[in-house]
């Protein structure tokens, strides 16, 4: 994985290896018709679920231009959730572009209410929000793309890209 990142011009200087906890994995179904693919995952108890505020506070964000966050780490553990918040807060404070893809994984959360609360709260820290249309229904309460985009604009997102499978994507810029 590290070599593939390097081969694609992605910096690996912030990668760490955990000698105790395993690497989580996710598999994703290949689909041709545009429906949401099945994506079984094995992440509970993984190294990522042990991510902590200490590691986030130790990061030098000085040369980072973009922080991309998904909704998976905050689902893994309370500790990883706190670390996710801290990363987004630090990035915003440092005026680093923050992108957020909710990546709903209900089976990883304690319950649906907690999932909605946390993911909608994390969207407050994002400059760009990238939900799927199904995620909009669950998180914003609508499949109307304009209304869903407005929901995220009200949280502060300058740009919302709503993914809609074979129908492409709906892009909305916040009007000043």
What are these regions (language model features)?
Residues 5, 88-91, 122-123:
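A generic structural signal for well-ordered alpha-helical segments
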Residues 1-71:
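Conserved N-terminal subdomain of the carbohydrate kinase-like
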């Amino acid at each position: 994985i590290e070599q593939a990142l390097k081969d694609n011009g992605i910096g690996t200087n912030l990668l760490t290896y955990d000698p105790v906890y395993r690497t989580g994995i996710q598999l994703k179904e290949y689909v041709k018709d545009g429906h949401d693919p099945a994506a079984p995952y094995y992440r509970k108890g993984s190294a990522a679920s042990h991510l902590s505020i200490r590691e986030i506070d130790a990061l030098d964000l000085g040369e980072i231009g973009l922080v991309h966050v998904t909704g998976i780490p905050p689902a893994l553990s309370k500790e990883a959730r706190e670390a996710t918040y801290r990363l987004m807060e630090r990035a915003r404070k440092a005026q680093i572009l923050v992108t957020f893809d909710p990546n709903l994984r209900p089976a990883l959360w304690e319950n649906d209410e907690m999932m909605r609360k946390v993911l909608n709260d994390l969207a407050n820290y994002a400059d760009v929000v990238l939900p799927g249309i199904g995620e909009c229904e669950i998180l914003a309460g609508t499949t109307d793309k304009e209304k869903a985009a407005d929901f995220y604009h009200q949280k502060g997102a300058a740009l919302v890209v709503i993914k809609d499978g074979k129908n492409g994507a709906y892009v909305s810029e916040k009007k000043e």
